[in-house]
Amino acid sequence: MTQRTLGGTVRKRKRTSGFRARMRTKSGQNVIKARRRKGRARLTV
């Protein structure tokens, strides 16, 4: 019996939480700003 792994899809992930998706909305831009302020190595996925 094969196991179902919850892999996820790259395209879906990029489209919902990628950099350009974040920059599209004001609140998303705030997320990027907050992560920059905090000094995160990775801003988005």
UniProtKB/Swiss-Prot annotation:
The Swiss-Prot or TrEMBL record annotates one GO molecular function as: structural constituent of ribosome
| PROSITE patterns given in the database record | RIBOSOMAL_L34 (PS00784)
Q: List, in alphabetical order, the GO biological process terms annotated in this UniProt record.
A: translation
The record's region (Disordered) falls at 22-45
Q: Name one Pfam family in it.
A: Ribosomal_L34
Alphabetical GO CC annotations of the entry are: ribonucleoprotein complex; ribosome
Supply the Gene3D superfamilies for this chain.
1.10.287.3980
Q: Which stretches does UniProt call biased (Basic residues)?
A: 33-45
* Keywords assigned by UniProt, alphabetized: Ribonucleoprotein, Ribosomal protein
Record-linked InterPro entries: Ribosomal_bL34, Ribosomal_bL34_CS
List the HAMAP family hit by this protein, alphabetically: Ribosomal_bL34
Family assignment? Belongs to the bacterial ribosomal protein bL34 family.
Q: Which NCBIfam families match?
A: rpmH_bact
The protein, known as: Large ribosomal subunit protein bL34
What gene name is listed for this protein?
A: rpmH
